[in-house]
Amino acid sequence: MKPTVFKTTNNNYYLYSPNKRRVIPISMHLYDAFLKNPSLILNDEFGAYLHDNGYLDEYQESYNGLIDESDIINALSNIPQIIFEMTSQCNLKCKYCCYNDCYTTFQNREEGVISFETAKAVIDFVASVCNDRNNSSVNSPLVFSFYGGEPLLYGDKIKEIVNYIKSKDFHNRVVKFSITTNATLIHKHIDFLAENQFAILVSLDGDSQHNANRVFHNNQPTFDTVFRNLKYCQNSYPEFFKTIRFNSVYTNASVTDEIIEFFLSSFGKYPTFSPLHEPQESQNAYIIKDLIKKIEP
């Protein structure tokens, strides 16, 4: 299938690129040139850009059901998100954590920390594929996310990685950053997070009663520490704080109205709720099963 041009009843002009699966606004001049001879649009700067970036390539349809090299290259060239698991280490020992011995899925998970060299190799590769002619996601977000464990245990390494990302060219992709955190260390890094406009998701189940399953390794509650840190961030960066989101795990102790009221009165926000997953049969699976409560319709 070859690219084609068309105009609307309002005299707006477009080119459809089947190779990129995109509709691109064009000028009347390019529209007329394309109708006369598609090669004529190469004399125009924007037309040359479309050619050089694969928008004018003919699309070869394939129905064999197989993924080939070009499919992989195209997908990687337009990848929307990269997630760095900074570490499998965590400074909490939440009673329902999917990495504890109540679940069997991750029992053989090894503790580790991502090296800067590994992150750099990933970033370099992403930059190279974003600059490939198959990239049709110009001006689309490219999100670099940081996960754990607790990623802020290695906050300085996150800063090193982010600074390297900011030094790279991703071919006009809109680079953004996000992080999921338990907020026990967020106060130490809020300046950096705010400066780089991180999208932050905080795991917090509600007030001290609802948050009782989120404990330190010594089984001490985390609520006071987390609440104090969040208030520090809210007071230090009130506008940025408005972008922070909260996720609450729904358990047998959850009272939805009370949780929502806590977040509204404390932070002016509504949380999202996540259910516990049914564990596979294991020696300690009953602990999770006792905590499970179906989210109310």
Predicted regions and their residues:
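A short acidic, amphipathic alpha-helical/loop segment
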Residues: 160, 188-192, 258-262
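Conserved alpha-helical substructure of the radical SAM core
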Residues: 68-189
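Conserved radical SAM core fold
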Residues: 103-104, 151-153, 183-187, 199-220, ...
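Auxiliary Fe-S-binding modules of radical SAM enzymes
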Residues: 1-20, 24-39, 289
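Hydrophobic faces of well-ordered beta-strands that scaffold small-molecule active sites
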Residues: 82, 142-144, 177-179, 200-202, ...
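N-terminal [4Fe-4S]-dependent radical SAM core
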Residues: 2-15, 20, 44-83, 101, ...
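Radical SAM enzyme [4Fe-4S]-AdoMet core and its adjacent flexible, acidic
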Residues: 214-227, 231, 235-297
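Glycine-enriched alpha-helix->loop->beta-strand junction motifs that scaffold or abut catalytic
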Residues: 194-200, 267-270
